């Protein structure tokens, strides 16, 4: 007998618990078969110790005439005597009757009262602390008893999909659960799901007219969007699965990055590209209009090929060259006459003129203007001026000042004077003994380590040869340097 039998009898099982007392009452009168067959035919005694509970308390549906004594004919049909509870399930000793054994159990106080569990309506025992021989026979069960808690039956729907979520919410969200989660307080920053929020990405819900002019409000809206996206992850009362949480977090992160990149693109389109030094990339000439493409007017004394280039070479280089070569213009004295032959002396006479001489000194004392690229310059259209331009280029090749006056001085340089020690170099290269050191010691050229340690004669000879070669080289180098100083300074 165990205590589990009290918890196993519930209100929902009246049909199983009622017929058991009948069997027990049928067995109870046979507690003393060892006293003889006369006591077996007598009814049950009326004492409080062995009196079973009345049938009105345990089984009111069955009348008492149904309690029949066992047959007395064949002793084999009689059931074995029940073991009293006071002796722990062991048979009484041979000199003790079952009544005395029951009295011993009563004196020890081993009779247990009925447990007061939830949902059990058992009457208290009649005999006080008497032996529980009149109690119903315990029913043995293989499975443990499962008592359903009332908190689990709150939901109205019986669908299988809602059941795991309800169990999770009882353990996590509500304070009625058991375990560590019941001891924890409610979270302070509890987010609530928005009901009217559209579950669309920002790229689809955004209008195409929105964009560059209001970048700051869009950034504020993005912050609110990201805050509103947070409840999707895990704010509802039903906790989703971790895979759904990960998927929602990934989608939210992708939406935020897309929104940030779109805002950056809009801001890049709005703001013009600026230089790091706050300077425009292309230096546009501020006063292009007052400078027409015909080359600006220059003093009339200048020759046609020597006008200074304009300040803005980009515009002037692409423009067609216009030379002031008109016959009636002031540049007429620079025009060559078709019947004259200009020699070098005639060009040198221009340098003697007062106005032209002043021009040359002023022109060449200033900065030098490089000639334009011949690929950009169009071919000359005026044929008789080609020889004049070639002569002018030839005049530039002579010198900057006093053209035609300087004399060419030829300086003779002899190679023998520069290469005074060539003979010594040749003799040195021919007679120098080079040290051909091989890395292999087996060929006999290099001494071995054992020869160096023991100072053998072969190592000493090799060392003398090396020093003799070094001595010869130093002597020849000193002699060469002495010859070079004599050839250079004369002493």
Swiss-Prot record:
Primary gene name: PRCC
Sequence ranges of Acidic residues compositional bias: 10-26, 262-272
A single cellular component GO annotation: nucleus
Pfam families in the cross-refs: PRCC (PF10253)
One GO biological process term: regulation of cell cycle
Quaternary structure, from the entry: Interacts with MAD2L2; the interaction is direct.
Region (Mediates interaction with MAD2L2): 1-100
Location of Phosphothreonine modifications: 239
Role, per record: May regulate cell cycle progression through interaction with MAD2L2.
Domain of life per record: Eukaryota
Organism: Homo sapiens (Human)
Region feature Disordered, mapped onto this chain: 1-244, 260-313, 432-454
Compartments in which it is found: Nucleus
The name this protein goes by in its record: Proline-rich protein PRCC
């Amino acid at each position: 007998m165990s205590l589990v039998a009290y918890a196993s009898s519930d209100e929902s099982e009246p049909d199983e618990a009622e017929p058991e007392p009948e069997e027990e009452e049928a067995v109870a009168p046979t507690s003393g078969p060892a006293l003889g067959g006369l006591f077996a035919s007598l009814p049950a005694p009326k004492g409080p110790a062995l009196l079973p509970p009345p049938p009105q308390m345990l089984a009111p549906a069955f009348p008492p005439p149904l309690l029949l004594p066992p047959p007395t004919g064949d002793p084999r049909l009689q059931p074995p005597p029940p073991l009293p509870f006071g002796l722990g399930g062991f048979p009484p000793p041979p000199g003790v009757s079952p009544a005395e054994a029951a009295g011993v159990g009563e004196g020890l106080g081993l009779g247990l009262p009925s447990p007061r569990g939830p949902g059990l309506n058992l009457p208290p025992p009649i005999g006080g602390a008497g032996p529980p021989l009149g109690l119903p026979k315990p029913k043995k069960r293989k499975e443990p008893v499962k008592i359903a808690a009332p908190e689990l039956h709150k939901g109205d729907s019986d669908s299988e999909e809602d059941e795991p979520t309800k169990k999770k919410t009882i353990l996590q969200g509500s304070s009625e659960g058991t375990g560590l989660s019941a001891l924890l307080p409610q979270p302070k920053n509890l987010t609530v799901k928005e009901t009217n929020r559209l579950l669309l990405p920002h790229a689809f819900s955004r209008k195409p007219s929105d964009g560059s002019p209001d970048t700051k409000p869009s950034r504020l809206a993005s912050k609110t969007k990201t805050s509103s996206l947070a409840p999707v992850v895990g704010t509802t009362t039903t906790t989703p699965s971790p895979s759904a949480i990960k998927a929602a977090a990934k989608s939210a992160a992708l939406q935020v990055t897309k929104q940030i990149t779109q805002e950056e693109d809009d801001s890049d389109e709005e703001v013009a590209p600026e230089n790091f030094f706050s300077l425009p990339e292309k230096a546009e000439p501020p006063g292009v209009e007052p400078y027409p493409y015909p080359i600006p007017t220059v003093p009339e004394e200048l020759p046609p090929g020597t006008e200074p280039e304009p300040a803005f070479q980009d515009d002037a280089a692409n423009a067609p060259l216009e030379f002031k070569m008109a016959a009636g213009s002031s540049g007429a004295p620079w025009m060559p006459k078709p019947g004259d032959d200009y020699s070098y002396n005639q060009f040198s006479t221009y340098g003697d003129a007062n106005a032209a001489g002043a021009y040359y000194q002023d022109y060449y004392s200033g900065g030098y203007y490089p000639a334009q690229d011949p690929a950009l310059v169009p071919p000359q259209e005026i044929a008789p001026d080609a020889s004049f331009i070639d002569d002018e280029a030839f005049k530039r090749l002579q010198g900057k000042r006093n053209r035609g006056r300087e004399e060419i001085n030829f300086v003779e340089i002899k190679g023998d004077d520069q290469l005074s020690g060539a003979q010594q170099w040749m003799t040195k290269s021919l007679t120098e003994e080079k040290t051909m050191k091989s890395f292999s010691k087996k060929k006999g050229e290099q001494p071995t380590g054992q020869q160096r340690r023991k100072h053998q004669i072969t190592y000493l000879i090799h060392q003398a040869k090396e020093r003799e070669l070094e001595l010869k080289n130093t002597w020849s180098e000193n002699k060469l340097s002495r010859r070079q100083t004599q050839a250079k300074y004369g002493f």
